[in-house]
């Protein structure tokens, strides 16, 4: 059964303007305590009071030992997150990851081996697969896009248009795929968009307002819709 929610309130990881210059995205991953809170929410959403089918069909003392394999070519992202789902829901499970994030895994590659109580592992399986598929899907698509500009000096930048609650895992996966991290939230930089420009009447006035009211070293960017705006 899922572990009880801890009363401990971990400190949430806050964003910083000083992002790493390398493409090591590990700073984007949640702390272990924060990840466990996320897992508890995922399990509560999926399992509810119990995994009714598994508890009916699988004997209480049954054991399971299986490999998690990929069905298509994918860029791995979130392998340790997926493994932690099993470890958290089934503490007695033995979980061994067989591949690292960032690797292009060919169809049929074994990603993880899991052994332990059958009921618990079956209950945890879909949650683990869902988060792994979500993260690998992002990394795989981004890798495809990034490969298109490998021969140029252009950089692929991510956004904050993410599924609520999944931002850091999404941005981590985008970076694994080849993106550069942009703002982690509304708090860590000024980005002037069409609505802001409309209020002030021009980019020049909007930028002047931003410069007047933000600390000197705060990064200010303008999202342009036309070449004329770029020139301004």
Which sequence ranges carry the predicted segments?
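Acidic/glycine-rich phosphate/pyrophosphate-binding loops and surrounding catalytic core
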Residues: 2-232
């Amino acid at each position: 059964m899922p572990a009880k929610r801890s009363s401990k309130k971990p400190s949430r990881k806050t964003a910083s303007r000083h992002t790493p210059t390398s493409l090591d995205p590990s700073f984007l991953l949640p702390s272990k305590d924060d990840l466990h809170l996320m897992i508890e929410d995922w399990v509560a959403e999926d399992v509810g009071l119990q995994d009714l089918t598994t508890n009916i069909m699988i004997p209480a003392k049954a054991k399971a030992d299986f490999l998690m394999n990929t069905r298509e070519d994918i860029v791995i992202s979130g392998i340790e997150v997926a493994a932690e789902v099993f470890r958290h829901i089934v503490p007695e499970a033995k979980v061994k990851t067989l591949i690292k994030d960032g690797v292009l895994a060919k169809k049929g590659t074994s990603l993880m081996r899991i052994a332990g109580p059958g009921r618990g592992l079956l209950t945890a399986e879909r949650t683990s697969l869902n988060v792994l598929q979500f993260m690998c899907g992002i990394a795989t698509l981004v890798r495809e896009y990034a490969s298109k500009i490998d021969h140029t000096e252009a950089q692929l930048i991510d956004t904050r248009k993410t599924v609520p609650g999944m931002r850091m895992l999404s941005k981590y996966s985008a970076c694994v795929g080849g993106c550069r991290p942009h703002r982690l939230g509304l708090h860590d930089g000024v980005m002037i968009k069409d609505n802001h420009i409309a209020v002030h009447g021009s980019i020049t006035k909007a930028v002047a307002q931003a410069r007047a009211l933000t600390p000197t070293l705060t990064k200010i960017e303008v999202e342009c819709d036309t070449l004329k705006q770029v020139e301004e």
